[in-house]
């Protein structure tokens, strides 16, 4: 798919894309209780999660209603994913808690991602692994209710272990610092507690005392990280937008912190009663921000930093190298195509803002990374541009291009 983007001014109201992080967690909750998700958007990552719980015995009706099995067991000995890193990393400890043997494989983007920390951790507790990357055969059953794991590679392992210890009727997790993307662990903890469980997270330790979980029926709330590209599009194009279907931002740093970050850079950016109001200003300020706890915000911040006055610095970026693409390199390449200079350091990237009238009108390949396409499309709204392999947005937000059209973006889809 090729998308041609012409200079446009974004305006209007848009519903935030459903949070795939929350959707995947809700789908995995169907291992314990009935879940009915209204109007579920079937992104590629969500489909990976659905296929995973189906392989563990969950009855799935119309890809929206999920009924837990009487007994959890591995129904399929081979689980094939597409590209959902969240699903993969949560699934590994879950199948280890259920016990048995299963082989997991996925597309090349996931095969490149390391699984070292979860393999190291669970190998100490009765689990055998064929390798530390995909394809991966897992054999055995967790032999301990008290797990130690390094927290530097992925928070998704810890989220998966919270599910695993609910399967084992309780236990504890000790996370060896540093703890990356802590906000996503807090999301999992909050979700279980909201459903009636008893999960405590103090310092670097999590204690799980399961209770029966209540059923859920409703719609998946919006995703601040994905919605931020609509906000970025408005700010770069000199427009305004209102984004609905978002929960109130939490106190801890996470994807929702983008509301505050954009405001600090000079934009009108306010949350009120479930709506995020965004309006462009004539100029934006540079910023220094650590995104280790919310790495998915990197491309949105980089996009606005491209036209901010002065030099911005995004730190805590080390794990961006193991996303759908090497996102550090992807940010550098995309900015360069639009005529924006940047400099990569050991754990940060400097972005040298320019006047937006100086932005180029390039052809950008999305590099099989949905966020590359979204960042580039926002920049292209200023002076135009072309996105190739633009179907990559289907990984997280299949409606992205239609949403831009509804916000008065001038684009053609080939």
UniProtKB/Swiss-Prot annotation:
Q: InterPro entries from the xrefs?
A: Enolpyruvate_Tfrase_dom, Enolpyruvate_Tfrase_sf, EPSP_synthase, EPSP_synthase_CS, RNA3'P_cycl/enolpyr_Trfase_a/b
Keyword presence, Amino-acid biosynthesis:
yes
Which SUPFAM superfamilies does the UniProt entry name for this protein?
EPT/RTPC-like
Q: Where's the active site on this chain? A: 296
Give the EC number. 2.5.1.19
Q: Which CDD domains match?
A: EPSP_synthase
Instruction: Provide the catalytic activity annotation.
Output: 3-phosphoshikimate + phosphoenolpyruvate = 5-O-(1-carboxyvinyl)-3-phosphoshikimate + phosphate
**Keyword annotations of the record:** Amino-acid biosynthesis, Aromatic amino acid biosynthesis, Cytoplasm, Transferase
* Protein residues bound to 3-phosphoshikimate: 20-21, 25, 154-156, 181, 296, 323
GO MF: 3-phosphoshikimate 1-carboxyvinyltransferase activity
Q: In which pathway does it act?
A: Metabolic intermediate biosynthesis; chorismate biosynthesis
- Per the record, the domain of life is Archaea
Where does this one sit in the cell? Cytoplasm
For the biological process aspect of GO, one term held by this record is: amino acid biosynthetic process
Q: Where does phosphoenolpyruvate bind?
A: 20, 85, 113, 156, 327, 371, 395
Catalytic EC class = transferase
Cellular component per GO, a single term: cytoplasm
One of this protein's Pfam families, by short name?
A: EPSP_synthase
Q: Which PANTHER family match?
A: AROM/DEHYDROQUINATE SYNTHASE (PTHR21090), PENTAFUNCTIONAL AROM POLYPEPTIDE (PTHR21090:SF5)
- What task does this protein carry out? Catalyzes the transfer of the enolpyruvyl moiety of phosphoenolpyruvate (PEP) to the 5-hydroxyl of shikimate-3-phosphate (S3P) to produce enolpyruvyl shikimate-3-phosphate and inorganic phosphate.
Can you tell me which family this protein belongs to?
Belongs to the EPSP synthase family.
What's the subunit arrangement here?
A: Monomer.
The protein, known as: 3-phosphoshikimate 1-carboxyvinyltransferase
Q: Which organism is it from?
A: Saccharolobus islandicus (strain M.14.25 / Kamchatka #1) (Sulfolobus islandicus)
Annotated gene: aroA
